[in-house]
Structure formats: C-alpha cells, structure tokens
C-alpha cells in the first residue's frame, strides 16, 4: 500500500464518514484526477477488500477501518 492508497482510504473514512461518497468528490478532496483514482488507486483497494463500490459511491470496509486501528461505527 502506497501513500495514495492510504490517502484515499483516510479521505473516505475521515472526511466522509466511511462513505458512500462519489469518486469525483474523493478526487477533489485529494486534489487528484478522477481517472487516476479509478484506474490506479481504486482497483488495488477493491481487490484487497478495503473499498466497496456501490450505486451511491465508494464505501470503506470494516477491513479498512481495522487496518488503521479504527472501529466502523455500524459494526458496534
């Protein structure tokens, strides 16, 4: 996991409460290109089980929260 992967996850978790949040909103918050996130960052995070795509946007999984030593509120 590189710095962009970590920033993506922390953005979704910390700025958007774990999601769902749209990719364009994430890109703007990260000051990055939507296409870069969709083509480079997101596929890795989805494959690792850290992010799920939904119709409403991207959602951080419980695994993503655990990776940072956090507890996902809806899993309490």
Where are these regions (language model features)?
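Terminal-proximal interaction/regulatory segments of ATP-powered molecular machines
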Residues: 12-76
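Hydrophobic residues on short alpha-helical segments
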Residues: 2-13
